[in-house]
UniProtKB/Swiss-Prot annotation:
Gene Ontology terms: cellular component: cytoplasm
Reactions the enzyme catalyzes: glycolate + NADP(+) = glyoxylate + NADPH + H(+); (R)-glycerate + NAD(+) = 3-hydroxypyruvate + NADH + H(+); (R)-glycerate + NADP(+) = 3-hydroxypyruvate + NADPH + H(+)
Family according to the record: Belongs to the D-isomer specific 2-hydroxyacid dehydrogenase family. GhrA subfamily.
Localisation: Cytoplasm
Protein name (Swiss-Prot/TrEMBL): Glyoxylate/hydroxypyruvate reductase A
Organism field: Shigella boydii serotype 18 (strain CDC 3083-94 / BS512)
Free-text function comment from the UniProt entry: Catalyzes the NADPH-dependent reduction of glyoxylate and hydroxypyruvate into glycolate and glycerate, respectively.
EC number: 1.1.1.79, 1.1.1.81
Broad EC category: oxidoreductase
Keywords: Cytoplasm, NAD, NADP, Oxidoreductase
Catalytic residue positions: R227, H275
Length: 312
């Protein structure tokens, strides 16, 4: 069994050694331009077209939860990957736990009005504010995949009313489910906090725009943990300036790194993190990949395969 590995920033040598240890029967090598030798599996992140084109692979693993970079490259270069080759993404591998930490900490930050107190502090103003009540602080999760379910589970501990929206209806205990475009407005109408965990597909690009934001209750909050292209940034800024949206926590952006001239940097109601909400944990990723390859070799059914038509 031959495995090729490519990631522009990861510690390649660590990964190769870890994979060799986890899959002793495999010959693992770092792919470099000009390497056309045979391979059974490819582990990649933002791979060059030539790495995958023309190869008779058993599977490709994207080294992250998102596969939009591969799928967008496939649109421009369909010869890059045979349609019959299954494409897998890392399903959780510790990212769910990180998303839980990030989401819960920020929801509680808003719930306890720490954002308002920070603004008061900046002007040396001492004024206790009325508290929010959990039963009136409905949290909506936009996108009900693996990470969305993890976030919902963690928020249930705090007794917040929870709802989710996705393409198809879900049956999560204690979570009100909405499905399809026809139910999006009803979903949004009660969301004091909107957490975006949608996949990046042509249908979801720009979905968080003026029309969507207007359907939220006045003074709602936005937490974007998915992709920057989901948000029309000018529309969000307008909603923040008008008070329609009271605050936004943004981990992802249309352009990354976020340009210094972006007005998001200086907006008093915006908090920014540099795409760190959930990162790949190498040891857990290696364990998932080795387990999945073993299942594939045995002809067993596996989880995490991407539906290329849907984009996730």
């Amino acid at each position: 069994m031959d495995i090729i590995f490519y990631h522009p920033t990861f510690d390649t040598q660590w990964w190769i050694e870890a994979l060799r240890k986890a899959i002793p029967q495999a010959r693992v090598r770092a792919w470099k331009s000009g390497d056309n030798d045979s391979a059974d599996y490819a582990l990649v992140w933002h791979p060059p077209v030539e790495m995958l084109a023309g190869r008779d692979l058993k599977a490709v693993f994207a080294l992250g939860a998102g596969v939009d970079s591969i799928l967008s490259k496939l649109q421009a270069h369909p010869e890059m990957l045979n349609p019959s080759v299954p494409l897998f993404r890392l399903e959780d591998t510790g990212m769910g736990e990180q998303m839980q930490e990030y989401a819960v900490s920020q929801v509680l930050h808003w719930f306890r009005r720490f954002d308002d107190y920070r603004i008061q502090q900046n002007s040396s103003h001492w004024q206790p504010l009325p508290e929010y009540h959990w039963e009136d602080f409905t949290i909506g999760i936009l996108g009900a995949g693996v990470l969305g379910s993890k976030v919902a589970q963690s928020l249930q501990t705090w007794r917040f009313p929870l709802r989710c929206w996705s393409r198809t209806r879900k049956s999560w205990p204690g979570v009100q489910s909405f499905a399809g475009r026809e139910e999006l407005s009803a979903f949004l109408s009660q969301c004091r906090v909107l957490i975006n965990l949608l996949p990046n597909t042509p249908e979801t690009v720009g979905i968080i725009n003026q029309q969507l934001l207007e359907k939220l209750p006045d003074g709602a909050y936005l937490l974007n943990l998915a992709r920057g292209v989901h948000v029309v940034e000018d529309d969000l800024l307008a909603a923040l300036d008008s008070g329609k949206v009271k605050g936004a926590m943004l981990d992802v952006f249309n352009r990354e790194p976020l340009p210094p001239e972006s007005p998001l940097w200086q907006h008093p109601r915006v908090t920014i993190t540099p795409h760190v909400a959930a990162i790949t944990r190498p040891a857990e990723a290696v364990e998932y990949i080795s387990r999945t390859i073993a299942q594939l070799e045995k002809g067993e059914r596996v989880c995490g395969q991407v539906d290329r038509a849907r984009g996730y």
